[in-house]
């Protein structure tokens, strides 16, 4: 709280980058409670912007911890939202909660409004400075700006620049100057002076505490890679796709490679789907999936020991396949995807934390952030994602304040496949965030045609 109050009183913005599960939402609620209730600033306006899936979660958390706060969700039809925003000048002292998407749509209504406090949650949503979401949050007139994210840097330094461009425009220069003086020297030349310079510039405005330093009594988290060996038709289909992609890459010139990145990404996605279950690509495929069998084995073993678990996948079609197996084996489960409504999300989370349902199937994109599911103590990542920070965020739906059991994390990996190389790539990308936020050595998060060929080895 003192850090937030100091920044606010001195006219600076900041990034609250605490490790996932350390209560960033609650810290903001305490900050607002101190200003609105304790200090009686009942004419101040606040805007909280978050992913659409978290709007009602924010409102619920505020109601739970500080019911006195004047919370108002900006939702409903365009006409209803316009009426609410138009009335704000005559009724100050509101804490508005809206989504990035609705802010973008309603940006004209916000042009004549001024906010004392502007908070963006899951600030990685604005890591690309050219997106409409990033442009929208930067257009708001606000006195104090705060960004919440457990991952200020996921892939490249330009993401950090975009967040600071929202917090304090110009502090990290224009992007072209930032890229020339800091980003390129660090990434391409391993320039230690540039690294120390950016660390020194951002340090006062980033508060990052790790669970191991703050929560001494948080139960341990054990991670284990579980390997599944593809056999028979699954292995044959996978190898055929690998050979086709290797041939495509080896024949391309650098210019052709640059112009076919979307096609290559599509082919890589197909390889990842084949590792999961060839039925995701071939409707008539019936020969089974090594990873699906392994996943069901883990689920059965966990249930026999009385555990509840989350199963994450990037592919909702894979979750459907797992659900089919669970139904056949009469195992109760919940499922949450991008198609799940906000109200239904809250209901599913509440019921899972209270009842005996052992399995919660969750798409990584839809449920990897903003959920509290400490009733579970086992996490299964069915397929690895390019960036380990995304999977860590998902794991921390379980490994967070309120967890009383040791947490087991199983990462399912198809043996001798692209998935093994994705895991290696995850480790490299994790280096970038560690360097900027206090680490030592410099690595590169990018890959060339040659590195893509290595992924296929």
Where are these regions (language model features)?
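ASCE P-loop NTPase motor core, strongest for the SF2 helicase catalytic module
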Residues: 1-191, 197-457
């Amino acid at each position: 709280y003192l850090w937030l109050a100091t920044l606010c009183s001195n006219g600076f913005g900041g990034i609250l980058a605490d490790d996932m599960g350390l209560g960033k939402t609650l810290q903001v609620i305490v900050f607002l409670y101190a200003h609105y209730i304790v200090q009686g600033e009942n004419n101040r306006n606040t805007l909280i912007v978050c992913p659409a899936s978290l709007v009602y979660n924010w409102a619920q958390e505020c109601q739970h911890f500080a019911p006195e706060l004047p919370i108002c969700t900006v939702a409903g039809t365009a006409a209803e939202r316009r009426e609410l925003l138009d009335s704000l000048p005559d009724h100050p002292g509101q804490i508005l909660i809206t989504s990035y998407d609705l802010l973008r749509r309603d940006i004209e209504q916000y042009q004549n409004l001024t906010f004392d406090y502007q908070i963006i949650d899951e600030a990685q949503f604005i890591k690309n400075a050219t997106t409409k979401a990033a442009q929208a949050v930067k257009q708001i007139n606000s006195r104090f700006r705060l960004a919440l994210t457990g991952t200020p840097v996921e892939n490249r330094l330009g993401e950090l620049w975009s967040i600071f461009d929202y917090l304090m425009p110009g502090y990290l220069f224009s992007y072209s100057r930032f890229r020339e003086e800091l980003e390129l020297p660090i990434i391409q030349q391993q320039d230690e002076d540039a690294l120390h310079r950016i660390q020194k510039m951002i340090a006062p405005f980033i508060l990052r505490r790790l669970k191991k330093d703050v929560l001494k009594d948080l139960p341990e988290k054990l991670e284990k890679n579980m390997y599944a060996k593809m056999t028979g038709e699954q292995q044959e289909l996978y190898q055929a796709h690998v050979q086709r992609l290797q041939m495509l890459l080896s024949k391309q010139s650098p210019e052709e490679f640059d112009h076919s990145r979307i096609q290559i990404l599509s082919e890589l996605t197909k390889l990842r789907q084949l590792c999961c279950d060839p039925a995701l690509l071939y409707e008539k495929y019936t020969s089974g999936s090594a990873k699906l069998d392994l996943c069901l084995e883990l689920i059965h073993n966990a249930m026999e020991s009385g555990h509840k678990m989350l199963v994450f996948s990037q592919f909702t079609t894979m979750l459907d396949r797992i659900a089919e197996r669970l139904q056949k084996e009469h195992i109760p489960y919940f499922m949450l995807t991008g198609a799940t409504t906000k109200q239904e999300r809250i209901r599913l989370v509440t019921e899972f934390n209270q009842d005996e349902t052992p399995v919660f199937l969750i798409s990584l994109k839809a449920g990897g952030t903003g959920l509290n599911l400490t009733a579970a103590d086992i996490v299964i990542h069915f397929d690895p994602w390019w960036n380990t920070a995304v999977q860590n965020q998902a794991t921390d739906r379980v490994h967070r304040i309120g967890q009383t059991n040791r947490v087991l994390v199983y990462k399912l990996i198809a043996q001798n496949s692209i998935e093994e190389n994705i895991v290696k790539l995850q480790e490299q990308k994790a280096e970038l965030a560690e360097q900027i936020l206090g680490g030592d050595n410099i690595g590169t998060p990018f890959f060339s045609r040659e590195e893509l060929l290595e992924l296929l080895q």
